[in-house]
Protein backbone atom coordinates (compact mmCIF):
# COMPACT_ATOMS: atom_id res chain seq x y z
CA UNK A 1 0.00 0.00 0.00
CA UNK A 2 1.37 3.40 -0.99
CA UNK A 3 1.66 5.80 1.95
CA UNK A 4 0.38 9.23 0.97
CA UNK A 5 0.63 12.60 2.71
CA UNK A 6 -1.00 11.99 6.07
CA UNK A 7 -2.20 15.59 6.33
CA UNK A 8 -4.92 14.76 3.82
CA UNK A 9 -6.42 12.69 6.63
CA UNK A 10 -6.68 15.87 8.69
CA UNK A 11 -8.43 17.65 5.83
CA UNK A 12 -10.91 14.80 5.49
CA UNK A 13 -11.45 14.67 9.25
CA UNK A 14 -12.23 18.37 9.48
CA UNK A 15 -14.64 18.21 6.53
CA UNK A 16 -16.52 15.33 8.12
CA UNK A 17 -16.66 16.84 11.58
CA UNK A 18 -17.82 20.22 10.27
CA UNK A 19 -20.80 18.50 8.68
CA UNK A 20 -21.52 16.45 11.80
CA UNK A 21 -21.75 19.64 13.86
CA UNK A 22 -25.24 19.91 12.39
CA UNK A 23 -26.67 18.24 15.48
CA UNK A 24 -25.78 21.23 17.66
CA UNK A 25 -27.15 23.72 15.13
CA UNK A 26 -30.71 22.52 15.71
CA UNK A 27 -31.59 25.54 17.86
CA UNK A 28 -31.51 27.83 14.81
CA UNK A 29 -34.65 26.12 13.52
CA UNK A 30 -36.60 26.45 16.78
CA UNK A 31 -38.11 29.95 16.25
CA UNK A 32 -39.43 29.07 12.78
CA UNK A 33 -40.84 25.75 13.97
CA UNK A 34 -42.58 27.46 16.90
CA UNK A 35 -44.05 29.96 14.43
CA UNK A 36 -45.31 26.95 12.45
CA UNK A 37 -47.23 25.70 15.49
CA UNK A 38 -44.68 23.58 17.32
CA UNK A 39 -44.20 23.69 21.08
CA UNK A 40 -40.75 24.05 22.64
CA UNK A 41 -41.12 20.48 23.92
CA UNK A 42 -41.57 19.21 20.35
CA UNK A 43 -38.36 20.90 19.19
CA UNK A 44 -36.52 19.48 22.19
CA UNK A 45 -37.85 16.00 21.43
CA UNK A 46 -36.27 16.02 17.96
CA UNK A 47 -32.94 17.19 19.40
CA UNK A 48 -33.00 14.61 22.20
CA UNK A 49 -33.87 11.84 19.73
CA UNK A 50 -30.94 12.88 17.56
CA UNK A 51 -28.55 12.71 20.50
CA UNK A 52 -29.89 9.29 21.52
CA UNK A 53 -29.44 7.76 18.06
CA UNK A 54 -26.05 9.47 17.75
CA UNK A 55 -24.82 7.83 20.96
CA UNK A 56 -26.23 4.36 20.26
CA UNK A 57 -25.12 4.13 16.64
CA UNK A 58 -21.66 5.48 17.51
CA UNK A 59 -21.05 2.33 19.57
CA UNK A 60 -22.21 0.16 16.67
CA UNK A 61 -19.99 2.08 14.25
CA UNK A 62 -16.97 1.45 16.44
CA UNK A 63 -17.65 -2.28 16.34
CA UNK A 64 -18.19 -2.57 12.58
CA UNK A 65 -15.40 -0.24 11.49
CA UNK A 66 -12.60 -2.85 11.75
CA UNK A 67 -14.62 -5.18 9.51
CA UNK A 68 -15.98 -2.74 6.92
CA UNK A 69 -13.18 -0.19 7.00
CA UNK A 70 -13.36 3.47 8.00
CA UNK A 71 -14.02 4.79 4.49
CA UNK A 72 -17.21 2.75 4.05
CA UNK A 73 -18.47 3.58 7.54
CA UNK A 74 -17.87 7.32 7.16
CA UNK A 75 -19.45 7.45 3.72
CA UNK A 76 -22.43 5.46 4.97
CA UNK A 77 -22.80 8.03 7.73
CA UNK A 78 -22.69 10.87 5.22
CA UNK A 79 -25.32 9.23 3.06
CA UNK A 80 -27.61 8.55 6.03
CA UNK A 81 -27.23 12.03 7.55
CA UNK A 82 -27.66 13.81 4.23
CA UNK A 83 -30.64 11.68 3.29
CA UNK A 84 -32.31 12.47 6.61
CA UNK A 85 -32.16 16.21 6.03
CA UNK A 86 -33.09 15.88 2.36
CA UNK A 87 -36.18 13.87 3.25
CA UNK A 88 -37.10 16.30 6.02
CA UNK A 89 -37.08 19.07 3.44
CA UNK A 90 -38.99 17.08 0.84
CA UNK A 91 -41.71 16.36 3.40
CA UNK A 92 -42.28 20.08 3.94
CA UNK A 93 -39.89 20.88 6.77
CA UNK A 94 -42.57 21.48 9.42
CA UNK A 95 -44.09 18.04 10.12
CA UNK A 96 -43.20 16.92 13.64
CA UNK A 97 -43.34 13.21 12.81
CA UNK A 98 -41.28 13.69 9.64
CA UNK A 99 -38.57 15.69 11.40
CA UNK A 100 -38.53 13.34 14.37
CA UNK A 101 -37.88 10.41 12.03
CA UNK A 102 -35.70 12.00 9.35
CA UNK A 103 -33.59 14.40 11.43
CA UNK A 104 -33.87 12.89 14.91
CA UNK A 105 -33.61 9.19 14.11
CA UNK A 106 -32.00 8.99 10.66
CA UNK A 107 -29.89 12.13 10.97
CA UNK A 108 -28.71 11.17 14.46
CA UNK A 109 -27.81 7.68 13.24
CA UNK A 110 -25.80 9.15 10.37
CA UNK A 111 -23.83 11.34 12.74
CA UNK A 112 -23.15 8.34 14.98
CA UNK A 113 -21.84 6.31 12.05
CA UNK A 114 -19.40 8.94 10.86
CA UNK A 115 -18.29 10.53 14.13
CA UNK A 116 -15.87 7.85 15.34
CA UNK A 117 -14.06 7.50 12.01
CA UNK A 118 -11.96 10.72 11.79
CA UNK A 119 -10.73 10.34 15.36
CA UNK A 120 -9.78 6.66 14.98
CA UNK A 121 -8.10 7.17 11.61
CA UNK A 122 -6.36 10.38 12.64
CA UNK A 123 -4.80 8.84 15.73
CA UNK A 124 -3.38 5.95 13.69
CA UNK A 125 -1.79 8.26 11.15
CA UNK A 126 -0.47 10.59 13.88
CA UNK A 127 0.79 8.46 16.79
CA UNK A 128 3.24 11.30 17.44
CA UNK A 129 0.51 13.97 17.60
CA UNK A 130 -2.54 12.20 19.00
CA UNK A 131 -3.69 15.08 21.17
CA UNK A 132 -3.33 17.63 18.38
CA UNK A 133 -5.20 15.54 15.82
CA UNK A 134 -8.02 14.62 18.19
CA UNK A 135 -8.37 18.27 19.18
CA UNK A 136 -8.50 19.42 15.56
CA UNK A 137 -11.13 16.84 14.67
CA UNK A 138 -13.35 17.58 17.66
CA UNK A 139 -12.98 21.34 17.23
CA UNK A 140 -14.33 20.92 13.70
CA UNK A 141 -17.41 19.30 15.24
CA UNK A 142 -17.95 22.29 17.51
CA UNK A 143 -17.20 24.92 14.89
CA UNK A 144 -19.56 23.19 12.47
CA UNK A 145 -22.47 24.01 14.76
CA UNK A 146 -21.58 27.70 14.62
CA UNK A 147 -21.13 27.57 10.85
CA UNK A 148 -24.55 26.04 10.15
CA UNK A 149 -26.31 28.32 12.64
CA UNK A 150 -24.83 31.38 10.95
CA UNK A 151 -25.47 30.06 7.43
CA UNK A 152 -29.11 29.31 8.16
CA UNK A 153 -29.49 32.45 10.25
CA UNK A 154 -27.68 35.78 10.34
CA UNK A 155 -25.00 35.21 7.67
CA UNK A 156 -26.79 33.32 4.94
CA UNK A 157 -30.39 33.93 6.02
CA UNK A 158 -31.38 30.66 4.37
CA UNK A 159 -34.44 30.20 6.56
CA UNK A 160 -35.65 33.77 6.08
CA UNK A 161 -35.09 33.73 2.32
CA UNK A 162 -36.09 30.20 1.35
CA UNK A 163 -37.98 28.66 4.27
CA UNK A 164 -37.39 25.54 6.31
CA UNK A 165 -38.08 23.02 3.55
CA UNK A 166 -35.47 24.38 1.15
CA UNK A 167 -32.99 24.97 3.97
CA UNK A 168 -33.20 21.36 5.17
CA UNK A 169 -32.83 20.12 1.60
CA UNK A 170 -29.82 22.33 0.90
CA UNK A 171 -28.10 21.40 4.15
CA UNK A 172 -28.71 17.71 3.51
CA UNK A 173 -26.97 17.96 0.14
CA UNK A 174 -24.07 19.90 1.67
CA UNK A 175 -23.63 17.47 4.57
CA UNK A 176 -23.66 14.46 2.26
CA UNK A 177 -21.13 16.00 -0.14
CA UNK A 178 -18.73 17.09 2.61
CA UNK A 179 -18.69 13.71 4.32
CA UNK A 180 -18.40 11.75 1.08
CA UNK A 181 -15.42 13.90 0.03
CA UNK A 182 -13.83 13.71 3.48
CA UNK A 183 -14.39 9.96 3.54
CA UNK A 184 -12.07 9.51 0.56
CA UNK A 185 -9.09 9.94 2.90
CA UNK A 186 -10.50 7.82 5.72
CA UNK A 187 -8.30 4.72 5.50
CA UNK A 188 -5.98 3.18 8.06
CA UNK A 189 -2.21 3.25 7.49
CA UNK A 190 -0.44 0.00 6.57
CA UNK A 191 0.12 -2.48 9.39
CA UNK A 192 3.18 -1.51 11.42
CA UNK A 193 3.53 1.90 9.75
CA UNK A 194 5.13 4.72 11.75
CA UNK A 195 5.91 8.28 10.66
CA UNK A 196 9.51 9.02 9.74
CA UNK A 197 11.68 9.65 12.78
CA UNK A 198 9.08 8.40 15.25
CA UNK A 199 9.77 5.45 17.54
CA UNK A 200 7.42 3.82 19.99
CA UNK A 201 7.91 4.95 23.59
CA UNK A 202 9.85 2.65 25.90
CA UNK A 203 8.69 1.59 29.37
CA UNK A 204 10.92 1.76 32.44
CA UNK A 205 11.76 -1.93 32.08
CA UNK A 206 13.00 -1.39 28.53
CA UNK A 207 9.98 -2.91 26.77
CA UNK A 208 8.30 -1.09 23.92
CA UNK A 209 4.96 0.53 24.62
CA UNK A 210 2.51 0.03 21.76
CA UNK A 211 -1.17 0.59 21.09
CA UNK A 212 -1.76 -3.08 20.35
CA UNK A 213 -3.09 -3.97 23.80
CA UNK A 214 -6.83 -3.40 23.57
CA UNK A 215 -9.55 -3.95 26.15
CA UNK A 216 -12.84 -5.56 25.25
CA UNK A 217 -16.04 -3.95 26.55
CA UNK A 218 -16.19 -6.04 29.72
CA UNK A 219 -12.56 -5.35 30.60
CA UNK A 220 -12.99 -1.64 29.92
CA UNK A 221 -15.99 -1.38 32.26
CA UNK A 222 -13.86 -2.78 35.10
CA UNK A 223 -11.16 -0.12 34.86
CA UNK A 224 -11.17 2.93 37.18
CA UNK A 225 -10.24 5.10 34.20
CA UNK A 226 -13.56 4.33 32.53
CA UNK A 227 -15.55 5.43 35.57
CA UNK A 228 -13.48 8.58 36.05
CA UNK A 229 -13.93 9.56 32.40
CA UNK A 230 -17.66 8.80 32.63
CA UNK A 231 -17.98 11.07 35.67
CA UNK A 232 -16.04 13.80 33.90
CA UNK A 233 -18.35 13.70 30.91
CA UNK A 234 -21.45 13.54 33.10
CA UNK A 235 -20.47 16.61 35.13
CA UNK A 236 -19.32 18.44 32.01
CA UNK A 237 -22.56 17.77 30.16
CA UNK A 238 -24.61 18.78 33.20
CA UNK A 239 -22.76 22.10 33.40
Regions found by a protein language model. Give the residues of each.
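Extracellular/periplasmic helix-loop-helix junction of adjacent transmembrane segments
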Residues: 25-58
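C-terminal ends and interior cores of transmembrane alpha-helices
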Residues: 79-93
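Helix-loop-helix hairpin linking two adjacent transmembrane segments in secondary transporters
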Residues: 141-191
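Helix-to-loop junctions at the C-terminal end of transmembrane segments
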Residues: 57-70
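Hydrophobic core of transmembrane alpha-helices in multi-pass small-molecule transporters
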Residues: 18, 84, 96-113, 234
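Intracellular juxtamembrane helix-capping segments at the cytosolic ends
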Residues: 33, 111-126, 133-134
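Glycine-rich segments within core transmembrane alpha-helices of 12-TM secondary carriers
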Residues: 126-150
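Pair of pore-lining "gating" transmembrane helices in MFS-fold secondary transporters
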Residues: 3-25, 219-239
Amino acid sequence: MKVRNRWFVVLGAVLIQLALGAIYAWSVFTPSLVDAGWTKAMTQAVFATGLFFFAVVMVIAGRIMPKLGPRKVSMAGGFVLGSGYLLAGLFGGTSFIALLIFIGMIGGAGIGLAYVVPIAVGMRWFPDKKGLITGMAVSGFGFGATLWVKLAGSWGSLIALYGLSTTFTALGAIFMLMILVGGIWMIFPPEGWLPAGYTLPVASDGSTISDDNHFNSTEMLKTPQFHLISMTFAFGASA
